[in-house]
Amino acid sequence: MTELTNADLLTAIVTPFTDEGTIDYPALDQLTEHLLQAGNNGFVVGGTTGETPTLSHDEKIELYTHFGRLIAGRVPVIAGTGSNNTAETIAFTNEVAQIEGIDYALVVVPPYNKPNQRGMLAHFTAVADAVELPLIIYNIPGRTGVKMETSTVLTLAEHPNIAGIKQCASLEEFQTLVENRPAGFAVYTGEDAQALTTKVLGGDGVISVAAHNYAPQMRAMYDALSAGNYQVAAKLQRWLTPRMAALFMFPSPSPVKAVLAAQGLATDHCRLPICDLTAEEKEQLATALGLPSDALAGQLPTDLGEGLTND
């Protein structure tokens, strides 16, 4: 098992699709190696950005098996296994636990059902008690319709098979988690714009969408922070923040995929109900990213911040 100990920049990786709509494994391999070289030191596969609701059970198993072999222990891999059915989550997580190279299971707060805090506590306790993989809680109220309160997270953090959380909430809540977590419980932000602040507060890092397109700058930001170059780190975060926001101006992951396509790293295809960006939307996105309006119709470099002054 590859642990999260030194993993601070993890990408919630997209699932590339071919023109025919199947998973594009050569593109996934190319993108993964690019991200590793750019400074990523962990991945979530089959998460929100991976369009997991549109993947069949067999596709997920095939995807996770392929990805585990590809990474081969170089960095930790977290696979999405959660659902709003506790028994189904247990069964699928135990199936994924048999896949070599998968280190953790990402289990989302159950969407749609809208359980209360007692229900969330019971759900995660039941899953953690019954599965082999250590769990990462995924608290993303904007998508699930309910929020796991900090007190509930801290109760679950004491469970020996719950290893951490991907938290999409306020900085105040993040700070409370960091201050009160038990030893060994990892706290990651799922909000790119919080990437620097959460590290300053003592968190473990970010599970990122923007790292697909801005990994060198995000790695440089964290390296600057570690070296005590706070002005450099802050400057990079200020440069990144509007670009991070732009990557969510249309339903994710369509903006990220549009940029990856222009970089030659993957196609821009999404699965319905997420649509590929139109030509007009690509122009709007390019402008918001600080690029010429026609930039996404051409070829972009793989380093979008090349030449950025950061000293």
From Swiss-Prot:
The active site is at 138 (proton donor/acceptor), 166 (schiff-base intermediate with substrate). CDD domains: DHDPS (cd00950). The keyword Transit peptide does not apply. It is found in: Cytoplasm. The record marks 48, 112 as: Part of a proton relay during catalysis. Pathway: Amino-acid biosynthesis; L-lysine biosynthesis via DAP pathway; (S)-tetrahydrodipicolinate from L-aspartate: step 3/4. One of its GO terms (molecular function) is 4-hydroxy-tetrahydrodipicolinate synthase activity. One of its GO terms (biological process) is diaminopimelate biosynthetic process. It is an enzyme of class 4 (lyase). GO terms for cellular component: cytosol. The keyword Amino-acid biosynthesis applies. Keywords: Amino-acid biosynthesis, Cytoplasm, Diaminopimelate biosynthesis, Lyase, Lysine biosynthesis, Schiff base. HAMAP family: DapA. This is 4-hydroxy-tetrahydrodipicolinate synthase. It comes from Limosilactobacillus fermentum (strain NBRC 3956 / LMG 18251).
